[in-house]
Amino acid sequence: MWLQQRIKVFPGLLSSSWARRVLAVSGFLVIIYWYIFSGSHYRSFWYSGKQWGVSGACLQAQIVQWKTLAEKGDVVMVSFPGEEIKLQGPAMVGNGQIIVDVGKNNLWVSSLSVLFHLTNYSPLTLFKNVGALAETHATAIFLKEGLIRTIRCLQVEASDSPRDCVTVREDHFAHRSRPHVYVQNIHITNPSDRVVTFDISSQKPLTGETFSTSLEKVQEKQFLLSSGRVSVEDGKIILVVVATKKLASRLQVSPKSEHDETVLSVVYASEPIDPAKLSDTFSKLRENAKKEMFELMHMKTEDLFHEHQQIWSDLIVSGIEMKKITDLHTPSRDTINITLYYMLSCSLAPLVDPALSNEEREKMESFLNYADHCFTGHSSMHAENLWPGSLSGITQLLQLWDLWKLTLQKRGCKSLVSAGAHGLMQGMLLSFGGLQFTENHLQFQSDPHVLHNSYSLRGIHYNKDLINLAVLLDQDEKPFLHVSVKFQDKLVKLYACEAGCLNEPVELTSEVRGHIFPVLITQPLTPLLYISTDLTHLQDLRHTLHLKEILAHEEHMAKQYRGLPFLFWFSVASLITLFHLFLFKLIYNEYCGPGAKPLFRSKV
């Protein structure tokens, strides 16, 4: 009976416009709450199970490790079905000589005297399945391997089992030690009971001047040779020649089998030339491309990839790892990783060029091992234009590359920039941490106000050794410094001391546990850490810094933020007092002043 009475009340409540508005707003807030806090897991299940069907479930099984690698910072997701993940920049591979925009199927070329220019050549070879019922794909950049990987899952027969889907894995990379080589490796797995057919083609440009293509043959080896031109300023042109492995127009993969295909491309571009020199220049480029293509076709794919990965691994020995970010202006881990990847992909690596003379190599290595006066000025950690959260395309990416080189050159790192990709990585590392080489030592001069962030800088070159420096936080959120060394050559003693060098310098060792230094702030402000091979130099620093005081980091920050000034609080207290006096006056005049109304009415 009581329940029936309560139910009868609801129509009356809903008849009120105010009640209907409250109900609508409450429902909207519930939907928003569900979408934010539980939507990602549900959407992942929905996409993988219902909306994407069998091919989606197959893809989930294929890339189950990608998310783990992404959490470690080894992979940057480009596209992933069912998740709101999209790379805020171009999906590209490069080596300083060529750039391949995998997402847009564009080829960019450069030469010694000119920066990158967009060509009208489409470098990707397309493998399209004939008769697939459904297809799902995902793409990611593998930072430690220097490549872009795409996995496609194809449902080719009416089956409810994801295990019957055909899987196509494509790897794209611009070879790091062979600057003219671009590789596209395709691996197809067909677990189904039917033959799977793929049409093989290359995308033709819709507008602009097309590349002319001819069939070349060198000692029973056939490949395609394409040539075209790029117009530049002053009426000159850049001639581009591309040699590509010749493939059949159709591929059939047998049931219960696998197939591997490696598409090799050799790209040569000329310096800007007058059109009158076109014929001679084409002959030279053609011979160079044919020679290198012939050499590549006699190599194993595994050896080619091993060459690339070995050089790329050497480049990323150095790096930046964000452990904890506590403010909005510090770039995220993914932003830092993808920026480093982009800058390396745009830069040549002359140190791995076999044509480099021993004298030039020793000179570049000396720059890399001790970059005197680099990096001067404040840290680049919070420079949002150097660590952008998004890039619109290759053009903006190249502008960022120019800005990084200009910044490093103006901050004392010109010698590092001349060392190519290895030097650029080192310069970016020094700039992020506020590290500077002087005549006798390496100093860490980070702003004390940014030490609430936890991060590590690995692979800092000091002579031929590698130093790892980390800013970490203890249980009370107080920062401290952790330093370790990885000796590369003969043992050379390294010493370090914290700000002021009042304590005896500590000899750095290669022990895994490393060495811990407190964060001390001096007045006047001096570097937080000194590292040197000269023990006497560090011992002398304490007598030459002429400091007024040395405080722990938390004491320094407490002095910087002593709270609001006395005048502010006095003003607030005065306003509160005046308000209450005014309120008291109103009440007094109402009941006690002239013409005041009586508090109680008379009964008569």
Swiss-Prot record:
Residues 585-604 are cytoplasmic. GO terms for cellular component: membrane. It is found in: Membrane. The chain crosses the membrane at residues 564-584. Pfam families: DUF2152 (PF10222). Keywords: Glycoprotein, Membrane, Signal, Transmembrane, Transmembrane helix. Glycans are attached at N337. Residues 41-563 are extracellular. It is a single-pass type I membrane protein. Residues 1-40 form the signal peptide. The keyword Transmembrane helix applies. PANTHER family: SIMILAR TO RIKEN CDNA 2510039O18, UNCHARACTERIZED PROTEIN KIAA2013. This is Uncharacterized protein KIAA2013 homolog. It comes from Xenopus laevis.
